[in-house]
Amino acid sequence: MRNHRISLQDIATLAGVTKMTVSRYIRSPKKVAKETGERIAKIMEEINYIPNRAPGMLLNAQSYTLGILIPSFQNQLFADILAGIESVTSEHNYQTLIANYNYDRDSEEESVINLLSYNIDGIILSEKYHTIRTVKFLRSATIPVVELMDVQGERLDMEVGFDNRQAAFDMVCTMLEKRVRHKILYLGSKDDTRDEQRYQGYCDAMMLHNLSPLRMNPRAISSIHLGMQLMRDALSANPDLDGVFCTNDDIAMGALLLCRERNLAVPEQISIAGFHGLEIGRQMIPSLASVITPRFDIGRMAAQMLLSKIKNNDHNHNTVDLGYQIYHGNTL
């Protein structure tokens, strides 16, 4: 015989309240009197009750759940964004369903369809370029959408981020103004739209200073090891190289470590700059120059925008540019 699954009515009877009160407490604890809530919580803890949210997610107008798509669990960038999102959702009793699509748009499409099947109230996407089918499903779902890390080009609904092209331009100009350089190479990673925008910003700065752009951009996911490999290849192909601008800090830290291995003085012989301003990069010796991006704030703002639009569909604050900072460090 199967064990009896504890019901809301069982908890209500033990706590001396109505089933409706227990249901309200599970959905929104703050809407129940403190003493009553504590009594219900105590009963739930004593009997190890775990709410079954699936029926409510499918039947209710609101599931109090948000979907989040990220391209990598290994990148600190997205850990910071998730922390920002959770800082908001936890305060409003929202749950998050997180899916990783490994920088593959077909995988993103599949993940979006899966998340929509849970009747999510809104969704956060890490990129702005999707398959036609992904866009079709999102538009049909008629839920709020926020796209992250970019405020250029068309958007599905809302967006929060910064101008990648301008940020790259400002950093490369800073490199060229700090020291006389003749050959600064762009070190990229796996091809994506943001990487391309940064490359365009790099090109803008190089051409402004009458220098020729150079690029090394393998189809591989970023890592410090990849940065070392890229820097090794770059120096072999360009012995007179005197600077590298990297699409992110992982690549830049790898380049810096390779220079240390080769006994190349940074920044005296070679200038190195990264992108995103990770804490580990600032703690390197010498401290890595980088574009500091507001990852936590981007996540927090994205969640706030979603919840605001869920509560008020007339919300029209659709583009938020949170900017960036240039950190000089000691590698320019």
From Swiss-Prot:
Location of the DNA-binding region in this protein: 8-27
Cited PROSITE patterns: HTH_LACI_1 (PS00356), HTH_LACI_2 (PS50932)
Entry-linked SMART domains: HTH_LACI
Keyword Transport attached: no
Top-rank lineage group of the source organism: Bacteria
Gene Ontology biological process terms in this record: D-gluconate metabolic process; regulation of DNA-templated transcription
SUPFAM superfamilies registered for this protein in UniProt: lambda repressor-like DNA-binding domains, Periplasmic binding protein-like I
Keywords: DNA-binding, Gluconate utilization, Transcription, Transcription regulation
Residue ranges annotated for the HTH lacI-type domain, each copy included: 6-60
InterPro entries to which the protein is assigned, alphabetical: Cro/C1-type_HTH, HTH_LacI, Lambda_DNA-bd_dom_sf, Peripla_BP/Lac1_sug-bd_dom, Peripla_BP_I
Signal peptide extent: none
GO molecular function: DNA-binding transcription factor activity; transcription cis-regulatory region binding
Biological function: Idn operon regulator. May repress gntKU and gntT genes when growing on L-idonate.
Protein name, UniProt field: HTH-type transcriptional regulator IdnR
